[in-house]
């Protein structure tokens, strides 16, 4: 296996996957076969891209990702590509992220952008209604997919560039580490249906109804919530 997997320095629940520069070099040619426009309009090309990615890693990368994401003890992976060359530009990162996503499954359609993925900037000032674009706004406890009809199992986010700023790491909390989980997941209110809607920028014109807490296949609590 030509990539390495280790525990993240901050949490054993997070697995770090290191992709070496030499292997990324082998992706440059197959990635150039697919333009960003082609990926946006031809769903099959995304699966083809993912196949090329997996073949570089002897078809072991997909198995590793699926195993990590399906293991409740982890469920999170940080992919760390060794990128020290200008040939690994923003388009390359979009393609790499696309390949990783399609090794796991078929991503949901993003209504906000009208594409299979969303791409945006976090700036010093922002007038939108999206917390994701506001540099100094803390995100409250939430799960993605709360207000859409599609089932949302996983989320992939890619930091493509930083200018005039350092840090900007994502903040995540494993549900089993939440100190209020037992209390709230067993409260009858958490089992009742709530109506969920989204801000205008998301371009979703319907509302959904479901409880905050449900159970997974092993009877452990899951959560679908956004404030």
Map each language-model feature to its residues:
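Preference for protein termini
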Residues: 1-2, 65
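Active-site environment of non-heme Fe oxygenases that use a 2-His-1-carboxylate facial triad
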Residues: 2-57, 72-73, 120-227
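N-terminal, charged low-complexity regulatory/assembly segments
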Residues: 43-50, 67-87, 92
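Well-ordered, non-membrane alpha-helical segments in soluble/globular domains
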Residues: 57-63, 90-100
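Short, charged beta->alpha transition segments
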Residues: 62-66, 143
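A structural signal for short, well-ordered beta-strand segments and their strand-loop junctions
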Residues: 77-80, 110-112, 156-158
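A gly/proline- and charged-residue-enriched helix-loop-helix capping module
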Residues: 98-132
